[in-house]
């Protein structure tokens, strides 16, 4: 959508004087350059396309030496010395457009239109250009400091409504919507933490409504998701109206979007809750705390964001029937192994549905990536291949993208980093929404430390079933093996066609957590559940509270978790519907809005048999994505990212009632209601 905005703004300013073609797929772009190179080539610079962009610039330079090469995006250093080094390291571009790109890029086009010579470089690169950093013909950098952000975003014509993005409504891409720009926070690890983008500007409600309607009428039937690229969705004035617009679209167009991917606001959580609760669970509430340690928060300039207020709202969130996702980062300044575990424990105690742990990336354009900050905290850094960001060019050259990550510091050893990654994987698998909600609630009811379950699953993994032990060992080794000393080492290694083929064949360069998640779901989900239940039972016993009553209660919890998690991805999954006898009404217990109902008060007069089934809607939603991305672990990795987690798990159906299948009233209800 970013290049769509730039194109629509240029078309508005220059009309028929310019011809603009947009590309998403590198194969099409390279072919177009080779067949008919343009006068100006503009490329985005994000962490997932930096090296590829440079290769495209090289191809372009060979075909049109007189053409202008324009780069733009957030992946650009903040300080002048690092910017100078950036221009030296990346030689195949002429002008950089930082921050918002519409004004800066259109200023380049305006200047280019005054040139009568076929060699536009000689004229355009002589002087500075507002909103740009220019490398002149002598290699000197020319700066301007004028503000180039557009405050009234409706001045930018919609790339959707003008038809510029129609070609991208294929069965591969997920549409993206932007309702506002800017971030009021100053987080040091983020490229949007700089003062230059502190002001939040927004598009009008009418514009957003028209774009949502356009997207819903053009999206392919097998695409069920929507990205909202706002940085604090739900927190900004007007977001409630946006959510109401989306809700109306969902009702009007059979449930689309089923899943919304976005980052919700970091403060004003009451307003965020009010905004997104109308979306029927299609958007989870993000608790992007990153850490709950006061020193860490101060060091990353997040002390103006109240984590305590976030956690205090947990009961309100539950009452609103919202999924919650907490995000934390391993390797932040002054973070220790113990402080990280404390953060995890507090988030688990707050009963958040998901706790997702990321490795700290040093992003060019963020304060934390500056040489001063890296030296201050004595970061130990390595480089990783970005998963699924690789390509083979027409020339036969292999290319991939890399990221710089923190794997240690003066406060965190490398061994600690690996251990925390193991815990991160365990949380990803075992603390995800509905799947083990009964088990976790039961442990809390017995006052057993829930975080201890996840920690002990890692600690006692040598006692796990062989297949689970192998998963853990594979995860640990992959976590170590994915690290390299330099990007040059990676880019040299990928030229080995055997190594490149290993990437294609899913043997390396994977998202380690998501890949192993897909492995477990597709190959050994039953064993994972059994292992988690074994550790939980041991913890209950170690606390001295395993007796005849709790044993029977735990048996029901055990069967419920096994039924829910059974065979989520197998081709025969619609035929393998496990049945269990239950003495307690687990569904009634779980659905108590006050969260005070005890399991012992849900004992039924007589046992019932419940069958655990998947609906046709669940089956087809997952199959739509798997059929597109491929029936492999990596294919599952991609597909599962676009499926709401509750859609994997089976639903219990009481055989006493005579109903052995779910009555699908409407596709909308089936797709959006929590199960």
Predicted regions, residues:
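Radical SAM [4Fe-4S] cluster-binding motif and immediate context
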Residues: 151-319, 330
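C-terminal accessory/interaction regions of large nucleic acid-associated machines
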Residues: 473-479, 491, 495-675
């Amino acid at each position: 959508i970013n290049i769509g905005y730039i194109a629509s703004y240029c078309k508005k300013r220059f009309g028929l004087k310019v011809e603009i073609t947009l590309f998403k797929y590198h194969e099409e772009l390279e072919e177009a350059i080779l067949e008919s190179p343009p006068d100006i080539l503009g490329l985005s610079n994000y962490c997932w396309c930096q090296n590829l962009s440079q290769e495209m610039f090289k191809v372009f330079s060979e075909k049109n030496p007189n053409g202008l090469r324009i780069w733009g995006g957030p992946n650009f250093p903040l300080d002048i010395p690092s910017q100078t080094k950036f221009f030296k390291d990346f030689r195949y571009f002429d002008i950089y457009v930082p921050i918002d790109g519409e004004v800066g890029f259109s200023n380049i086009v305006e200047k280019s239109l005054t040139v009568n010579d076929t060699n536009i470089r000689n004229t355009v690169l002589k002087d500075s250009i507002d909103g740009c950093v220019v490398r002149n013909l002598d290699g000197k950098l020319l700066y301007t400091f004028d503000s180039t952000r557009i405050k009234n975003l409706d001045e930018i014509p919609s790339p959707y409504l003008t038809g510029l993005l129609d070609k991208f409504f294929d069965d591969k891409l997920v549409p993206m919507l932007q309702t506002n720009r800017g971030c009021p926070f100053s987080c040091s690890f983020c490229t949007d933490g700089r003062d230059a983008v502190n002001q939040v500007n927004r598009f009008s409600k009418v514009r957003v409504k028209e774009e949502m309607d356009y997207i819903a009428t053009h999206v392919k039937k097998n695409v069920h998701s929507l990205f909202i690229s706002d940085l604090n969705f739900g927190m900004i004035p007007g977001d409630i109206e946006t959510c109401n617009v989306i809700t109306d679209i969902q009702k009007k167009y059979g449930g689309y979007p089923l899943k919304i991917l976005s980052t919700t606001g970091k403060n004003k959580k009451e307003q965020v809750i009010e905004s997104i609760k109308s979306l029927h669970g299609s958007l989870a509430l993000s608790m992007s705390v990153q850490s709950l340690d006061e020193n860490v928060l101060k060091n990353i300039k997040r002390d103006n964001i109240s984590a305590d207020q976030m956690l205090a709202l947990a009961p309100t969130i539950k009452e609103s029937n919202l999924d919650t996702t907490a995000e934390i980062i391993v390797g932040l300044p002054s973070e220790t192994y113990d402080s990280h575990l404390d953060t995890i424990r507090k988030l688990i105690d707050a009963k958040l549905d998901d706790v997702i742990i990321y490795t700290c990336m040093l992003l060019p354009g963020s304060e934390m990536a500056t040489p001063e900050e890296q030296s201050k905290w004595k970061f130990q850094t390595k480089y990783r291949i970005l998963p699924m960001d690789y390509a083979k060019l027409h020339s036969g050259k292999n290319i991939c993208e890399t990221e710089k990550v923190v794997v240690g510091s003066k406060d965190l050893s490398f061994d600690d980093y690996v251990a925390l990654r193991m815990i991160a994987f365990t949380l990803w698998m075992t603390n995800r929404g509905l799947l083990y909600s009964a088990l976790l609630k039961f442990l809390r009811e017995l006052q057993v430390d829930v975080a201890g379950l996840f920690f002990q699953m890692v600690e006692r993994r040598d006692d796990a079933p062989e297949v689970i032990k192998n998963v853990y060992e594979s995860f640990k080794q992959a976590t170590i093996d994915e690290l390299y000393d330099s990007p040059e080492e990676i880019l040299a290694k990928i030229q080995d066609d055997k190594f490149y083929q290993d990437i294609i064949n899913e043997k390396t360069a994977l998202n380690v957590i998501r890949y192993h998640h897909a492995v477990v779901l597709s190959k050994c989900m039953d064993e994972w559940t059994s292992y988690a239940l074994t550790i939980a039972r041991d913890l209950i016993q170690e606390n001295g509270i395993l007796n005849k009553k709790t044993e029977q209660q735990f048996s029901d919890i055990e069967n419920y978790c096994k039924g829910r998690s059974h065979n989520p991805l197998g081709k025969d999954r619609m035929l393998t519907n496990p049945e269990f006898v239950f003495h307690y009404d687990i569904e009634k217990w779980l659905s108590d809005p006050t969260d005070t109902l005890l399991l012992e008060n849900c004992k039924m007069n007589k046992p019932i048999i419940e069958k655990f089934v998947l609906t046709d809607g669940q089956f087809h939603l997952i199959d739509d994505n798997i059929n597109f991305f491929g029936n492999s672990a990596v294919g599952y990795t991609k597909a599962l990212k676009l499926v709401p987690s509750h859609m994997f798990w089976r639903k219990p159906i009481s055989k006493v009632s005579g109903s052995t299948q779910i009555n699908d009233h409407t596709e909308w209800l089936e797709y959006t209601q929590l199960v």
